């Protein structure tokens, strides 16, 4: 028996494949099962092209057998098998694909899918074995052959006995090392799990003898083990079934089986696309957020299959971050994979799929908002913040996609409303979309700054998430209506009462306000008469793009730079406090400082900002009570 050498820079290339191409050792089982599936596909194709042949599906299956004691794992199939020449050409030449050659020779048309195209999948067996044997008998042949290799040094081929056509791959599993536990590939549960993970949707049965227990015949209280053959894989994936055959329960069961969440999905999306790139997908919109969703540990992505074989557990490139909550799978035969089937070679197809999926999710969410408002609001409660992050991120490049999905609490409706709904009922004289920022709806309703806008009869949107105002600043406008904070220096409201709108108030009290500004030097940019206050004595407004609420958010972040908004102290000259304030200016400068500090600190407290000196503040209160 002659030992032959591999025909492709044997040792170096084989070492490269074992050590570099495959990142997970368990992949070997996926590759060998995929090869077995290809072998049966080849017979199926022959029956389509040769009238004399018939294909009985029950005759075709894959059997996985393990022998823990002798450290042997066997993968057998009833596929087309290989002749001596094919064994030498396909297994003796690393990186030559018998499946690819079969496709070329038989001019395989579209719709007939063979998984293996690279000719290296078989060699993944050397990840877990240093003694690999292949026994094969070709379809229509009377001769069988045994191929054996112990690594890169070469291989042998010799005649052997085998009754039925097909192929058996026998692996002598390596001994454990300090770094690797090879025993797991001789464990029933592990093997079953790997098959379910990677090869669940191979279209032929993958069988194993599984350990069961039953009561002993002579003693029903004691149990004994026995073996029973079972089919491990599902074979027909749900996403390849006709949608009309499936019920909501089928999708919910699939969602649960995949451990996508403990709840039921709010929405499932089943789509099949044929075109430049063809794919099937089932997507789920969960009801509640995963516990780690808003943390760095959360990993977005869809399961990616190529021809029913799992390629990636979480393909993040298929989802934009703002739709990172979506769960599901994508299966395509058009992906350009590298030779390990683990990494995409070119991402053009993936980008096309991702673009289609993004549009599909957006359309489905808009449909949910329009037709099932209660469900959408439940979804938005869980994932609305992520949509707003999407508007803010990437310099607002996604705002046009997401703006119609946003919702905010309305002062008028006392419920969540969309921007479109807000704009549709704006009075003709209203120039801006008004919003107020606070920790809660209740806190916002008590803000002094909101009085003037509400008194005018305008609707105000309540922003209670840290991200809200940042997102709106990036959005800038909606349907040509700009956003305006109720805390802005200029509210842009026409027709205020004359005494409030006239600039004469500031002129009349110019010296008083200048004195107060000097007292608060470095704390406020200006002091002036308020045009917005009705019942409250004082408030803080801001000028410029950075609001007081944004200041609070930014300064709460790690490594903050003590960012400050430009603040303006506004005084309600019609409030009872203004008279003693003016009297103090005219006759008691110490009292003016006392009153000014009190009013400023009061405004800080209303905004939820920290008072610089709480002791001084309480002492000042005591002084005015004496």
Swiss-Prot record:
- According to its UniProt entry, what is the function of this protein? Molecular chaperone. Has ATPase activity.
Q: Which family does it belong to?
A: Belongs to the heat shock protein 90 family.
Q: Name one GO molecular function term.
A: ATP hydrolysis activity
According to UniProt, the name of this protein is Chaperone protein HtpG
Q: Tell where it localizes.
A: Cytoplasm
Please give the residue ranges the record annotates as the region B.
342-552
Q: Where is the composition biased (Basic and acidic residues)?
A: 498-509
Q: Write the gene name.
A: htpG
Its predominant location is cytoplasm
Query: Which branch of life, at top level?
Result: Bacteria
Gene Ontology cellular-component terms listed: cytoplasm
How does it associate, per the subunit comment? Homodimer.
User: Region Disordered: which residues?
Assistant: 490-509
**Known Gene3D superfamilies for this protein?**
3.30.230.80, 3.40.50.11260, Heat shock protein 90, C-terminal domain, Histidine kinase-like ATPase, C-terminal domain
Q: Extract the ranges annotated as region (C).
A: 553-626
Question: What are the alphabetically sorted keywords of the record?
Answer: ATP-binding, Chaperone, Cytoplasm, Nucleotide-binding, Stress response
Q: Which SUPFAM superfamilies match?
A: ATPase domain of HSP90 chaperone/DNA topoisomerase II/histidine kinase (SSF55874), HSP90 C-terminal domain (SSF110942), Ribosomal protein S5 domain 2-like (SSF54211)
Q: Which residues lie within the region annotated A?
A: 1-341
């Amino acid at each position: 028996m002659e030992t032959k050498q591999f025909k492709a820079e044997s040792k170096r290339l084989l070492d490269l494949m074992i050590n570099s191409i495959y990142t997970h050792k368990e992949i070997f089982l996926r590759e060998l099962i995929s090869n077995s599936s290809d072998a049966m596909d080849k017979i199926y194709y022959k029956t389509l092209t040769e009238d004399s042949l018939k294909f009985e599906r029950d005759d075709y299956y894959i059997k996985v057998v393990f022998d823990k004691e002798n450290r042997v794992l066997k993968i057998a199939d009833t596929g087309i098998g290989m002749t001596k020449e094919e064994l030498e050409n396909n297994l003796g030449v690393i990186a030559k694909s018998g499946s690819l050659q079969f496709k070329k020779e038989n001019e395989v048309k579209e719709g007939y899918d063979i998984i293996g195209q690279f000719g290296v999948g078989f060699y993944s067996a050397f990840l877990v074995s240093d003694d690999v044997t292949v026994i094969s008998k070709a379809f229509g042949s009377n001769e069988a052959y045994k191929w054996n290799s112990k690594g890169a040094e070469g291989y042998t081929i010799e005649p052997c006995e085998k009754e039925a056509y097909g192929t058996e791959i026998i692996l002598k599993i390596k001994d454990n090392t300090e770094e690797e536990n090879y025993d797991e590939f001789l464990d029933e549960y592990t093997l079953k799990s790997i098959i379910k993970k990677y090869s669940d949707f191979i279209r032929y049965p993958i069988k194993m003898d599984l350990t069961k227990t039953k009561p002993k015949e002579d003693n029903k209280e004691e149990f004994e083990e026995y073996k029973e053959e079972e089919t491990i894989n599902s074979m027909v994936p749900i996403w390849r079934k006709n949608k009309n055959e499936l019920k909501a329960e089928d999708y919910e069961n699939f969602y649960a089986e995949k451990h996508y969440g403990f709840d039921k999905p709010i929405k499932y999306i089943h789509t099949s696309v044929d075109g430049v790139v063809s794919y099937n997908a089932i997507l789920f919109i969960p009801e509640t957020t995963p516990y780690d969703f808003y943390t760095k540990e959360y990993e977005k992505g869809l399961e990616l299959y190529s021809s029913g074989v799992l390629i990636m557990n979480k393909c993040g490139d298929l989802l934009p971050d703002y739709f990172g909550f979506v769960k599901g799978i994508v299966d395509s035969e058009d992906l350009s994979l590298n030779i390990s089937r683990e990494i995409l070679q070119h991402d053009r197809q993936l980008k096309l799929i991702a673009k289609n999926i993004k549009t599909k999710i957006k359309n489905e969410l808009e449909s949910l908002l329009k037709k099932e408002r209660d469900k959408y609001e439940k979804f938005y409660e869980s994932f609305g913040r992520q949509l707003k992050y999407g508007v803010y991120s990437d310099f607002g490049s996604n705002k046009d996609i997401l703006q119609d999905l946003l919702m905010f609490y309305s002062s008028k409706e006392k419920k969540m409303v969309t921007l479109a709904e807000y704009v549709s009922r704006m009075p003709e004289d209203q120039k801006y979309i008004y919003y107020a920022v606070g920790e809660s709806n209740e806190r916002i309703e008590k803000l002094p700054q909101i009085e003037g806008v509400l008194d005018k009869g305008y609707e105000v949107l309540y922003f209670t998430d840290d991200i809200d105002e940042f997102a709106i600043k990036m959005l800038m406008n909606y349907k040509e209506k700009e956003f305006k904070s109720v805390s802005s220096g200029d509210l842009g409201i026409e027709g205020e009462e004359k005494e409030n709108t006239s600039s004469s108030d500031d002129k009349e009290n110019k010296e008083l306000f200048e004195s107060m500004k000097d007292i608060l030097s470095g704390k406020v940019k200006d002091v002036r008469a308020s045009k917005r206050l009705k019942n409250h004595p004082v408030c803080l407004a801001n000028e410029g793009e950075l609001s007081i609420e944004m200041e609070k958010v930014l300064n709460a972040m790690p490594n903050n730079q003590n960012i400050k908004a430009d603040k303006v102290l506004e005084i309600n000259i019609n409030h009872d406090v203004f008279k003693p304030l003016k009297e103090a200016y005219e006759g008691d400068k110490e009292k003016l400082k006392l009153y000014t500090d009190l009013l400023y600190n009061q405004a800080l407290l209303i905004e939820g900002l920290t008072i610089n000196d709480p002791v001084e503040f309480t002492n000042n209160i005591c002084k005015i009570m004496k």
